[in-house]
Amino acid sequence: QPERGKIYDRNGKVLAEDVERYKLVAVIDKKASANSKKPRHVVDKKETAKKLSTVINMKPEEIEKRLSQKKAFQIEFGRKGTNLTYQDKLKIEKMNLPGISLLPETERFYPNGNFASHLIGRAQKNPDTGELKGALGVEKIFDSYLSGSKGSLRYIHDIWGYIAPNTKKEKQPKRGDDVHLTIDSNIQVFVEEALDGMVERYQPKDLFAVVMDAKTGEILAYSQRPTFNPETGKDFGKKWANDLYQNTYEPGSTFKSYGLAAAIQEGAFDPDKKYKSGHRDIMGSRISDWNRVGWGEIPMSLGFTYSSNTLMMHLQDLVGADKMKSWYERFGFGKSTKGMFDGEAPGQIGWSNELQQKTSSFGQSTTVTPVQMLQAQSAFFNDGNMLKPWFVNSVENPVSKRQFYKGQKQIAGKPITKDTAEKVEKQLDLVVNSKKSHAANYRIDGYEVEGKTGTAQVAAPNGGGYVKGPNPYFVSFMGDAPKKNPKVIVYAGMSLAQKNDQEAYELGVSKAFKPIMENTLKYLNVGKSKDDTSNAEYSKVPDVEGQDKQKAIDNVSAKSLEPVTIGSGTQIKAQSIKAGNKVLPHSKVLLLTDGDLTMPDMSGWTKEDVIAFENLTNIKVNLKGSGFVSHQSISKGQKLTEKDKIDVEFSSENVDSNSTNNSDSNSDDKKKSDSKTDKDKSD
C-alpha cells in the first residue's frame, strides 16, 4: 500500500498524515503452544485482563469475557483494541503477556483534532480492503492525488510454486501527493476558540467564522458549528455540508453594501440628500425600518449608518429594479464562484415579484453563501476588483518534486470603479465608527475596524415562511481592518441562539468577531503600531536535532524564533517544528532534550503551543477554556512520565467588557417582525 499524502497549512505544519498504529490480538487456543517451550496462548486470563485494562479503554471483566470465548483460536478487542499508539505498544510489550501480540496498521492522524474539520475533512479505512479513502473535505476532493498508487509483484510459477527465471516484474508503490492549504494554523486557533466560546454562551443552531486575506483572497481560517473531530470520529456525519460554500441562507443587512455600491455607481446615492424613512407598503405587506417607525426625513448616509430598510428600497427605485438585479449578478450572486472544487451552491436572487425585489434590497428573499459574500466584499478594498476566494495553495509530490496544481490570486470581475469602492468603504467606516453608530460593539481598542452588521429572519426548513420563536434570527458581521488598507476580512454568522438569546440579538457575533480580528491583527503585526510588518519575511526553522542544547538555542534564536527546551538533558533529540518549515518570527520552537522529561512553564502559551508539546512528548494534556494558558496542574521543572496527565486552563486577555448602552448595538434590521409577518402571509 502507498503512503497517503499529507495535508499542510500555509507554513508547513502538518494537518493530516499517515501514522503507524497497532491492533491488539490474543491467541486463546492451547494448541498454539503445542511443541513450544514457552506458552503462545493466553494462560492467565484474569491477570491478562487486569493488566490490559490499564492500557485499553475496557473493563477487566469485559476483556476476560472475550478471552474466555470457546472454539476461537484468536480474538480481537473491537474498536477499543485498535488505533493503539507506539507508546501503548511499548507498555503492553513490557507486560510480557503470553498470547498477546500487536499488529501494525496504518491510520490517518489529525494532530489538532477538531480543527478546520469541514475544510480538511476526513479519510476513513475501507473495512474490506484496508485502504484509506477520503470521505469529506480536502481528503475527498483531492483523494485521487492523496491516495497515490499501489505497488505490484508479477511473476510466472509452476504448479509447485517455483518462479520461472526472469519473469518477476515488480512495481513500487507511488507515494501520494501532498496538499498545501492557505489556512494559517495560528489564525485557525483564534477562530476555533472564538466559536467554542460562542457555543458555550449562546448554544446556536449554526455558527461560522471565516478569515480572508483582503488583498489576495486566500482563506486564512474557517470553521463552523456543529462540527466533528476527524481524529476520534466524534460527531462525524452530524452535519456533512461545508457552510462556507455548500449551504445558502438569507444574509440580512450585510447584503445592503452591494446595493449601496450599485446606487453610488449609478449616481443615485447622495450622502447628504434626504429621504423619508419609516415604512413602505408593497403588495399588501408593510415593510418597515427595524424600529418600526423610522427617523423621519434623514440624509442617505445616516440612513445607511442606521441600516434603514426603506433607504435600500428607495435606492432600488432610483436605480431601477431590473438594473439593480444586474448589479447583484455583477457582484457574483446567483452563481458559483468556481473556486471551491466541489458542490458549491449558487444561491438565488429572489426577483419573481415586487415584494421579493424590495426585501432582497435588505438581504431577505435572496440566498447566498459566505464565499460569495467574501468575493463581493473584496471589491471595496481592491479598487473595485473582486478577488476569488481560495484555500488550496498547491498539490505536489515530495518525491518526484512534480507540482500538479498551484493556487493563485485571481480577479473574479470588476463590478465597480475605484472611486465607488472608496465611497462604499467610507460608509462602512461610518457604520462602526460614527457618533451615531449602532454597531459600536464591534469596535476594537487601538484598531480601525469598519464593516456592516446583519440581522435576518431564518427560513423555515420545510419551506413554510420563517422560523418562529423568541429569537428567530441569523445575526452576522462582515468587518475588515485596518480601514483604508485592510489586511484581513472577518465574516462571522450565527443562527437561532438558544441561550442568552436577548444578548445574542443585541450583541450579534461581536464576541466572536472581536477576538478573532484582534488576535489576527496582533499575530500579523498590523494595527496599533505605525510600522506595518505584515509582509515581513518568514523565518526558516533550522535543523538542530542532535546538537548541543546551548548551540541549538543559539541557532533557533538567530532565526528570530523563540526556543523552549523541555527536559534535563544536554542534547536535542527532537524539535516541534520540522527543519526547513517557514514560520512567522517569534514563533515558539519546542526542543526536546535527552534525559528526564520536565514540565515547562506554559504561562501565556497558545493552544497550538500546548498541542505541539503534547505531540512532541506523547504526554496527554487536557485543555479547558480559550485564549492563553493561565494555569497548569503540574509545576515548572517537575519530572514527567508518559503516564502523566496534565490539566491546562486558558483564559483570554481580550475579555470583552465593552458592552454598550445603545439598545441597537446590532440593530441594523431589528424588529422587522411587522414587515416579515406580513411577508409570511403573502408568500
Q: Model-found features: residue ranges?
A:
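Soluble non-cytosolic domains of exported or imported proteins
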Residues: 2, 39-46, 82-86, 132, ...
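Juxtamembrane extramembrane loops of integral membrane proteins
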Residues: 3-56
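Beta-lactam-recognizing serine transpeptidase/beta-lactamase-like catalytic domain environment
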Residues: 16, 158-167, 207, 212-252, ...
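Second-shell loop/turn segments in exported
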Residues: 27-41, 49-52, 73-82, 105, ...
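Small/polar-residue-rich segments within soluble enzyme cores
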Residues: 47-54, 68-175, 492, 511
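Conserved SxxK-family serine transpeptidase/carboxypeptidase catalytic domain
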Residues: 81-95, 101-118, 122, 393, ...
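Conserved, well-ordered alpha-helix/loop/beta-strand core segments that scaffold catalytic motifs
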Residues: 164-207
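Ligand-recognition elements built from short beta-strands and adjacent flexible loops
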Residues: 446, 460, 492-683
